Regions:
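Short, Lys/Arg-enriched N-terminal segments with co-localized hydrophobic residues
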Residues: 22, 30-41
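Cysteine-centered motifs
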Residues: 3, 7, 15, 21-24, ...
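Metal-cofactor-binding active-site regions of metalloenzymes
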Residues: 43-298
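Short intrinsically disordered, low-complexity coil segments enriched in acidic
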Residues: 1-7, 36, 41
């Protein structure tokens, strides 16, 4: 940096120690001769203290949180894949098979839908994700993706368009190993409980099977997600209500019977361990109304 009045020589390092130029008295930043050399080294992006920027944070994480079990009360893992202990063929199936957060960023990056949910090959989809990821520095997805690459695949580099082939081959080689099935990945993460995301009409058959499986000691419980029962504006709403009527045994033809059907399904969920709900409400449409008005509207 140089002084605005060209009083100081150009230097290639800035530290927090401010000094004034002897000629123009402007506050400048110059090389600090008293700082230790190791303090001037650039911090690694993904070291053991990633995101831990204070001594207190490091102590709390490494001495306490790091080895504590995970209770995951909201996720999008398919309970069928846990039950059947799925073995993925490639990293695209793991990362892009149903992750709408990644899909959203790819769309924002101008990626054609063919490479997101379309008929492109898994390798092509991964390439487009890698090219998107390099533009997401500062986004949690950038952190999550690189943390996963390091922890589960041993990759400590950067995923981008140029390294996509290398990462693709490395991850797929690891996924071919027997210890990288869905259940084993969950166990490696020290997870003790998982709550999946389930619709009121879901049968929960895989939760029932997992509850009886003595070979897997991680609890897998359902979570109540009734969004489809509330989305009256959706064109598929009436078809959904027919399915709700079938599984509940209550013909939904009024607001009262809708509530009765949902309550019956809530009881069904509760009997299978459900104790949490999950709602994707962008906003709450509220207006005071009597029971008669609600029935007339519905």
């Amino acid at each position: 940096q140089i002084c605005r009045k060209d009083c100081l020589k150009s230097i290639d390092f800035i530290c927090i120690d401010g000094v004034k130029c002897n000629k123009c008295k402007r506050l400048q930043y110059r090389r600090c001769k008293h700082r230790k050399q190791e303090e001037r080294k650039m911090k690694k992006f993904m070291d053991e203290d990633f995101l831990l920027t204070s001594d207190a944070a490091k102590k709390l994480y490494h001495d306490y949180a790091e080895n504590m079990p995970i209770v995951d009360y909201h996720c999008h893992i398919n309970p069928q894949e846990i039950c059947e202990d799925r073995k993925f063929e490639n990293i695209t199936q793991v990362w892009l098979g149903g992750d709408h957060y990644k899909w959203r960023q790819m769309r924002s990056n101008g990626v054609d839908e063919k490479y997101i949910t379309g008929d492109a090959t898994d390798r092509e989809k991964f390439q487009k994700w890698a090219e998107t990821l390099e533009k997401l520095i500062g986004n949690p997805l950038y952190h999550w993706s690189h943390l996963e690459l390091k922890r589960y695949f041993g990759y400590e580099g950067y995923l981008n368009g140029e390294t996509a082939e290398e990462v693709w081959n490395l991850c797929n080689e690891k996924l071919a190993q027997d210890d990288m099935t869905v259940r084993n990945i969950i166990k490696k993460s020290n997870v003790k409980l998982i709550c999946t995301t389930d619709d009121p009409i879901d049968t929960l058959e895989y939760h029932e099977k997992l509850a009886k499986d003595d070979t897997f000691d991680v609890k897998v419980l359902p979570a109540w997600r009734p969004d489809k029962a509330m989305n009256l504006e959706k064109p598929e709403y009436l078809d959904y209500i027919k399915k709700l009527s079938e599984v509940s045994g209550i013909e939904v033809k009024s607001f009262k019977t809708l509530i009765e059907a949902l309550v019956k399904r809530m009881d069904y969920f509760q009997e299978r361990g459900c104790s949490v709900s999950d709602h994707a409400l962008e906003y709450v449409m509220y207006a005071p109304a009597s029971d008669e008005e609600i029935e007339a509207i519905y």
